[in-house]
Amino acid sequence: MSYEGSDDWRRVLNDGIREYSAGARSSDAFGRVLCNAREHHFVIDGPVWNGCPGEALTPGEAFLASVAACGVELAQVIGREDGIDVGPVAVRIHAAVNREDPVREDLTVFNRVEMRFEIGGVDEDQARRLVERMGRRCPLYGSVAASAAELEVKVEAHSTRGTG
């Protein structure tokens, strides 16, 4: 559903509320989940260590890819808002859960998360500011940062513009 050109689009822009919806249901194959968001449909598999297929993205991989995608997209958006000509952006994220040493007893959260941002067309200071602002704006990153026992974020700037 596109809000552009409708009153709903203006409401989203004016009241500051951002809403997201997605769904999932089991399939005929154990551990294979049929997912949807808006009109997009995709498969997520449970991991092999749970006896699931593990062929498609796992829930953890899909979540981490979403965190990384939010970082890339918002670095570009914030750069545009600030009049910075941001070049190619890449984000790598790695996370670990240690079931033998849980962070919390009531919920499973990541013990350690490492993120690496590479941002082209900017200097080191601009890159760090973009990542800092992204962190305040992305609810996925915020969820990870607020819950992980350890969070390491590395930022690398490339003042030359690449082809992305």
What would you call each of these model-derived segments?
Residues 70-71:
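Alpha-helical metal-binding/catalytic segments enriched in His/Glu/Asp
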Residues 1-65, 76-164:
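Extended beta-strand/beta-hairpin segments
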